[in-house]
Amino acid sequence: MVDQVKKSQTDLKKTNRSYKKKLTTPPTVLKTGKMDKILVISDLHIPYHHPDSFRFLNKLKDRYDWDKVINIGDEMDWHSINVSHVINPDLPSAADELEVGKFWIKKLEKMYPDMILLESNHGSMVLRRAMAKGMSKFFLKDYNEILDVSSRWQWKEFHWETNTLGRIYFAHQVSKNIVKSVQLMSASVCQGHYHTQSNI
């Protein structure tokens, strides 16, 4: 199964030439009070991630000395157990999606062994599926055990940072309107979820 996913990603790379540009644009670096550099990763949707995403993340690792890595959600897609969309029976099963997902998550953990990850609509799908069926979260394994990662990866509902200009609120989603998000939190907001939107 892992080999099939690798092959499909290789094939996608060959057909999608528009994404073959060299990584020349440096990312935006958030400076905190201690001048920390924070890498924000959002919406990978493993195993359906973009074929260049891991190459890109590896280049960022080699190019910058990140003080902190915050994954603002949807690290996994969990299409096979989705509670709010029709499940495509021709896509990988839950077991297959987990097997392939763990393969890629291990690569990500090797690149970034310390990470804060935020609860999200896809990343939290196992819990959402259990709750939809009336099962308590206390019957479930934690994310670290499900994905076979160390306790250096920490899942949280949201995360706050403070820099010289004020506070930054990190969450998977607050509001599609970023101005409303900022007003609601009375702080700068960094969120994911809205794939086609990029606002400052």
Language model segments and positions:
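Conserved beta-sheet core of the metallophosphoesterase superfamily
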Residues: 164-200
